Amino acid sequence: MIPIRSLLFAMILLFPFCLYAQNGKRDSVTTERNKFISNMTDGVIELTDDVATVVRHTGRKIRKEVKDFNAIDTLYITPNLYNLAFMLEHSTWHEHYQLGNNAGTESQYLNFSPSLGTKLGVYFGWRWIFLGYTFDVEDLFGGNKNKTKKKEMSLNIYSSKFGIDLYYRKTGNDFKLRSINGFHQDFKELQNIQFDGLKSTINGVNAYWIFNHKKFSYPAAYSQSTNQRRSAGSFMAGFSYSQHKISFDCEKLPASVLQQLSPSLRFNHIKYSDYSLGFGYGYNWVFAKNWVSNLSLLPGIGYKKSRIDDNDFKDESWIKDINFDFITRAAIVYNNAKYYVGASVVLHTYDYRKPNLSVTNSFGTLRIYAGFNFWPKKEFRNNME
């Protein structure tokens, strides 16, 4: 048996070595932990650097794409030199409807249109975005309290390569019967009488591509965001989609007209959707310094899916659902980069035809405006000093 005194003596001798071993193990764990944390930190920093690099690269690529997308030939087009714009506008709205029965020599046609609507507007713009407020001139003088107000909303985007038109129109009840044709007697005495039996709603979108965008500028003629320096033209291709709802109460026609009215014109509601592909041409004519005039025509072939009086209108041949649409634009502008004044007209025409019924509706806007640009862009400030 080992004496207790010897055992105690051995434990005292081994105690420092036990402490050293424990401290060594603890130091090893601490070292491993610090190494792990260091690796994690380095990994996070490296990942952050990679993300920042990707973001910078993506940002540069996007800026390059935008720059290339809006590239222009500066011999033909001068870019907008300012950030902000202020504009006053006078606009006149027009619409027209022709209803016909397509019965050969017995064809009947009724033409309706309201009085021209006039509005005044104030606009504030940042680059190519314009926001403003318009009001009806008749409202300033009281107007007709019983008249249902029209609703017109539109958004036009004119860039160097493409353009987009978004619009919504809802007519009031102030139509007039402008002409009556194809009846057995002359109804000249009924021309221009008030007719509140016609209402319509139209909403849609037009999108078009400009092929010669480096030399031909739509914004120069319609949004004053560039200046056309030399005459140039371009072919254009476009697509449009629109929905049309027409309500017609023939019972509100004069009795003498209603008595002879064809059965195909005694409908109550027409609803149709129009899908159209178009191809046309536009030309900017620079006829004097800082002056440009534009004329563009974009005819289209449209397919129309219709519903009459809540019944789907089906025909044996789909080719009979193919009709023609037309978009016309014209403008004249004076723009010296700082101040501008001009006028423009945009006219939409839609043609709907079935074996016994036709509806041709058109609407357009005449704008007369004046304004000025301010706050020069950073890249052009030195050239203006």
Regions picked out by a protein language model, each given a short descriptive name:
Residues 93-119, 130-146:
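Surface-exposed strand-loop-strand hairpins of Gram-negative outer-membrane beta-barrel proteins
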Residues 19-79, 378-385:
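Sec-dependent signal peptide cleavage junction
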Residues 204-207, 362-385:
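Outer-membrane beta-barrel "beta-signal"
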Residues 88, 120-126, 133, 153-159, ...:
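Residues on the lipid-exposed face of transmembrane beta-strands in outer-membrane beta-barrel proteins
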Residues 154-269:
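Outer-membrane pore/translocation modules
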Residues 82, 114-120, 147-151, 158, ...:
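Residues that define the transmembrane beta-barrel architecture of outer-membrane proteins
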